[in-house]
Design a protein with these regions (language model features):
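Nucleic-acid 5′ end/cap handling module spanning
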Residues: 2-63, 80-122, 184-290
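Covalent nucleotidyltransferase core used to form phosphodiester bonds in nucleic acids
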Residues: 62-185
Length: 290
């Protein structure tokens, strides 16, 4: 069982104040997001109590499916929702032991969207990657990592399943519970496999993740764009950032000094990498490089 250090036990690195990886910035943004999401939950509860005395329709922002009258005119409908993207785990939260951790294989992040009869695969920027037939129920959206070598879609998160929306004010721990309950469902063929997950406290760190580790705050909603409630570390950063001993061999990149320096270098080079990188389709893309 892993022991997560307190923030006070970590040495504070000099950081760039304008960087998304700023220690103070990530801590504060994490608090602000949790506060805002709590306010949303409280508001929803208040509205539900109000409905007991006076009916009222509550409109929520849900994935936008193309109107039926336009579907024939658009053989490849646009992606109904955007991805939720991870930040580097630059600052270690005091409650990290309760966060979920998912070891991730190497592959390409994508959204699997099932319309009425066909399944569309979309990339990070909403670009259509491919179309195929699956056994998945219609009106289903899964956040996956596609492994080109095995042709397997590894499921990270569930945004919608069979018309049931999980993208609106549904906590991560609830989404993951519902997702794991689908294990063994006949509609999930061998091409779709749910990635294992556990809490940081229960993680043993005996097997190295091929690409890295995703960390999810248990109370976080699914929100598009970068979120401080979803964070990312490469395997060689775990001991440096979490101060946890890993049983797997640590292989660090050439010239590696510290995890924070590596993050800063990746952050400063991101625009250049995106500009020079060819289109995602048909490539292996590391999750921290997209």
């Amino acid at each position: 069982m892993a022991t997560v250090p307190d923030l006070s036990s970590l040495s504070l690195y000099k950081v760039k104040t304008n960087s998304i990886c700023s220690l103070a910035s990530q801590i504060e943004r994490r608090r602000e997001v949790l506060k805002r999401q709590k306010e949303k939950r409280d508001e929803q509860f208040s509205q539900l109590r109000f409905l007991e005395s006076e009916p009222e329709v509550i409109e929520e922002k849900k994935p936008q499916w193309p109107p039926r009258r336009h579907r024939r005119a658009h053989p490849h409908p646009p992606c109904p929702i955007e991805m939720m993207l991870a930040e580097w785990l630059f600052s270690v939260p005091e409650d990290l032991s309760s966060w979920f951790v998912i070891p991730c294989p190497r592959g390409q992040r994508c959204l699997v969207v099932v319309h009425s009869h066909r399944t569309h695969i979309y990339g990070k920027h909403g670009n259509l990657l491919r179309t195929m037939h699956t056994n998945l129920p219609k009106q289903t959206i899964l956040y996956c990592i596609y492994d080109h070598r095995s042709s397997i879609y590894h499921i990270l998160d569930m945004i919608m399943w069979n018309g049931q929306d999980y993208s609106t004010q549904i906590e991560c721990q609830c989404r993951f519970f519902m997702l794991m309950s689908l294990a063994g469902d006949s509609r999930l063929t061998k091409s779709f496999q749910i990635l294992s997950r556990t809490t940081v406290e229960e993680e043993t760190w005996t097997n190295e993740a091929e690409d890295g580790y995703l960390f999810y705050h248990p109370l976080g909603f699914y929100e598009t764009g970068y979120s401080p409630l979803v964070c990312w570390l490469k395997p060689f950063m775990i001991e440096d950032i979490l101060q946890i001993h890993c049983s797997y061999p640590i292989v660090k990149p050439l010239g590696y000094t510290t995890a924070h320096d590596y993050m800063f270098n990746e952050q400063s080079n991101r625009k250049k990498e995106i500009f020079n990188k060819s289109k995602e389709e048909g490539e292996f893309v590391s999750m921290d490089q997209e």
